[in-house]
Amino acid sequence: MQYKTVIFDLDGTLLNTLDDLAGATNYALTQHGLPARTKDEVRWFVGNGIRKLIKRAVPAEASAELQEQVYATFNTYYKAHCNDKTKAYDGIMELLAALRKAGCRTAIVSNKADYGVQELVKQYFAGQMDAACGEREGIAKKPAPEMLFAVMEKLGAEKNATIYIGDSDTDIETARNAGIPCIGACWGFRGRDFLVQHGAKLLAENPQEVWKLLQD
């Protein structure tokens, strides 16, 4: 296998977190007298961090102060409810097991708040990730490549032996900015057509296809 380090996005790639993200978003909105959003709307709001999620979810006329209040409420609620309905996508655990058996290092780079990343890694991927990096102060979030670079440096990974897997245009752009290839996860929050429109060169309909692509 050419790739010795396989780095994954989290939301919409390893885990289906949409129900919990939508639940926390709507809890935060309604606590401040704002209208709730549909799950499909939230699906398109996620991917660029919680602040951007909240900015997209609140009405356009909402003040910066109100946005900040909704953001704080979201964080408090989501910390306690980030794993109420979340689950791994079918085939993910088998893919990770196969990669580990093949001697690959596996890691996560996500724009999800780091507290959520670490909690979900502990719940789902204990002993299966060599590194996990979520959004936090002091490091630029995706599509800037710094988070990928930080994980690669920690693992001693070389660019020509590293690949990123994600379900969004942000993931494609992040990999491009880092100078590594990307596999688009068509089972995630965006879908095949969207990924193709945003420049995906490698696409997988399911985790089993990821494994096949990694063998080529």
Tell what function each PLM region has.
Residues 84-87, 113-165, 169-178, 192-194:
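Substrate-recognition "cap/lid" segment bordering the active-site pocket of phosphatases
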Residues 28-29, 49-63, 120, 151-152:
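Helix-loop "lid/cap" segments that line or gate small-molecule binding pockets
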Residues 92-122:
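Substrate-recognition element of Asp-dependent hydrolases with the DxDx(T/V) motif
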Residues 1, 101-104, 155-161:
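Glycine-rich phosphate-binding loop signature in dinucleotide/nucleotide-binding domains
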Residues 202-206:
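Short acidic-hydrophobic, aromatic-tinged amphipathic segments that line or gate anion-handling sites
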Residues 1-44, 55:
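Active-site neighborhood of HAD-like aspartate-dependent phosphohydrolases
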Residues 55-94, 102:
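Metal-dependent phosphoesterase signature
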